[in-house]
A protein has these predicted regions:
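Core catalytic alpha/beta fold that binds nucleotide/phospho-ligands
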Residues: 1-113
């Protein structure tokens, strides 16, 4: 689980390269929500993934080692895919589903593994 405060438009433009790849950014820009909201959601989702997996895999991985592959704003769900093999049970390509909600300026995400 993770909670993040909504990034401003300016901050999102400054930070996106550390959170998402150029291709992932382009995909987020095609979504209906504003980019800063989607980047905050992606940041929080990737933090949730790290918090869920690190106790199992015991190896460091960063934001660019996972990719947001789906966001459903109606159902408030998302899917992340690993781009790096972490362990035999967590190979590249493995997908993780999660949920999110927004309350005021806070975005909360969680993933069950």
């Amino acid at each position: 689980m993770d909670v993040e405060t909504l990034l401003s438009d300016v901050r999102a433009e400054e930070l996106w390269g550390a959170i998402v790849s150029a291709g992932e950014r382009e995909a987020l820009l095609r979504e209906t929500l504003p980019f800063n909201e989607l980047l905050t959601l992606t940041f929080s989702a990737k933090e949730s993934l790290f918090k869920a997996l690190y106790p199992q895999v015991r190896c460091y991985f960063d934001f660019l080692d996972a990719r947001m592959v789906a966001v459903d704003t109606q159902r408030q769900t998302f899917v992340l895919a690993l781009l790096k093999t972490l362990t035999p049970n967590c190979p590249a390509g493995r997908r993780f589903s999660g949920h999110f909600w927004r309350e005021g300026d806070d975005v909360t995400t969680f993933i069950f593994c």
